[in-house]
């Protein structure tokens, strides 16, 4: 995707692939992840998070998985139907309770903020 120029991106991070940078950020994202509608790069980043949940590599204290919230039902069910795949992967795994699809950013915020800490 488009990466706006900045000092970090041009001077330091250019030595790392986007996937490595994103994986490092997701590994530290213990309160949850909110994914807004996007295209190829956004889908790839969302599934990096889904993969961490699938293998339970994001469990915090007490083994609680942080939420991953996709915002925009129409987008994630119709435009780029990633939601059915996320639900299929979740199945009866523990991650099923950690993945959510909502319509608004406000709903996403409520989900993330209501998570037990």
Predicted regions and their residues:
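Acidic/glycine-enriched connector segments
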Residues: 1-35
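Glycine/proline-rich loop-helix segments at beta-alpha junctions forming the active-site rim
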Residues: 36, 53-56
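Short glycine/serine/threonine-rich phosphate/pyrophosphate-binding segments
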Residues: 41-50
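Short gly/pro/ser/thr-enriched loop/turn and capping motifs at secondary-structure boundaries
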Residues: 1-2, 42, 75-78
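Solvent-exposed alpha-helices and their adjacent loops that cap or buttress functional pockets
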Residues: 5-6, 18, 25-28, 56-64, ...
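Thr-Gly-centered strand-to-loop micro-motif
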Residues: 35-37, 71
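C-terminal functional extensions of proteins
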Residues: 61-117
